[in-house]
Amino acid sequence: MSRFRTFLLTAGGLGHAPVASGTFGSLPPVAIALLMAFLGQPVWLITLVMLLLVAVFSVACVRFGGEAEALFGRKDPGQVVADEVAGQALALSFLPWADPSISGAAWQNLLLGVGAFLAFRFFDILKPPPASSLESLKGGLGILVDDLITGLMALVVVQVVARGLLGWQSIPMG
């Protein structure tokens, strides 16, 4: 497998972390979303970037996941964290990010990012159905699909808490 493919599947090498590689692999989308929110980027642009991450890392998993399993000698190897990047990016999509110039917006954005991260890690580790049964799919799909499902679960929970319970809405940026 080429260096580029390995770099992509391990999220720049984060998948080689000695412990909690999935947690480390989940961090890049969180950092990108928070940076964009704190810089006042519009919600649509943050969502677009997150969906592009979902697309790029999903394609990488499906296309090169089988090669990675052969290289690392096991199904869904821990070094492959492109699935975590995709799932975490999905969990960060469509959130009610707020303009940082508005009072309290920085806290709202920080809580959204941290909440989405914790919710995704919780569901990714717990693997509630149907995510648990989808891990049995072959190759890259087996690596990816459970993380997309847990990313969707995290997104729903964060949306319900943020919009439903806390009444947060997107505050226009720019």
Q: Where in this protein do the model-derived segments appear?
A:
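Interhelical loop and helix-boundary elements at the membrane-water interface
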Residues: 1-27, 60-92, 120-154
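Helix-coil boundary and interhelical linker segments in multi-pass alpha-helical membrane proteins
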Residues: 34-50, 92-111, 160-174
